[in-house]
């Protein structure tokens, strides 16, 4: 392991794309799960100052997930068990009225003649669409590549590739619409993420499987939350209203709903809402399709 770590430290030093280099190098040196989990600290120990400084800017949990994936293991060990649990769990709706019982339309980011979600013209366009089609909700798609994610917060020191694939499902509705908890749990974090095109008001809930495996749900682009960190939450309980432009990061009013199987090295009230296209299998293990919880018919995601 020491020789491998030394070799990897050399390959990563000066590499344009750390993720790409890790995956390529480890394809020739498959490791056990225990070895994969232990590798990153060994690389740091063998690295020179410039590489250590670069690694310090990145999420160590995500790098370990990349290493695990490159070695043929599940990026997140408990992800499959969490997804299996959710397939059979009883869930409440995440908004009121219940999206499962309400007419809706798909809002792929490249929908013809649709203004961008960050363009204030979207509101009038969507209001007209809702009135014309007699429906309440619009859905932004999980796993969709979006051109809007070009701001600096979607890039990092790993390399030139921005994070551009959406890790949640968006539910567009009027500001003030009630956002509710689908599962029992506790409030993990309440935060205001103020950067332009960030989440604005954000709530993260912590849940657990019957075997005690933790997982989380994230609610972004809210109005002022009705809950506080540490609160116990019941299914159907109101978390917050849907936020408007001035408080939700600068987006047309909508809920970003995301399932998270590992918080990686993130300890605050924010989490990655988009992932690298080239590493989609890793990101899909971290944040699987949240329709496991929403239970919306697949037809609503198609035009």
Model feature map: region roles:
Residues 85, 94, 98, 228-247, ...:
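Acidic, glycine-rich catalytic/binding loops that coordinate metals and/or anionic ligands
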Residues 181-223:
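Zn2+-dependent peptidoglycan hydrolase active-site motif and core
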Residues 171, 177-187, 233-236:
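Generic structural motif
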Residues 175-178, 223, 229:
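Short, conserved secondary-structure segments in the cores of folded domains
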Residues 176, 190-193, 243-246:
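Short beta-turn/strand-loop junction motif enriched in small, turn-promoting residues
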Residues 165, 173-175, 198-200:
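A short beta-loop-beta micro-motif enriched in histidine and acidic residues
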Residues 166, 207, 221, 254-256:
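Histidine-centered active-site/metal-ligand motif
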Residues 1-170, 282-303:
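Polar/charged, compositionally biased leader and regulatory segments
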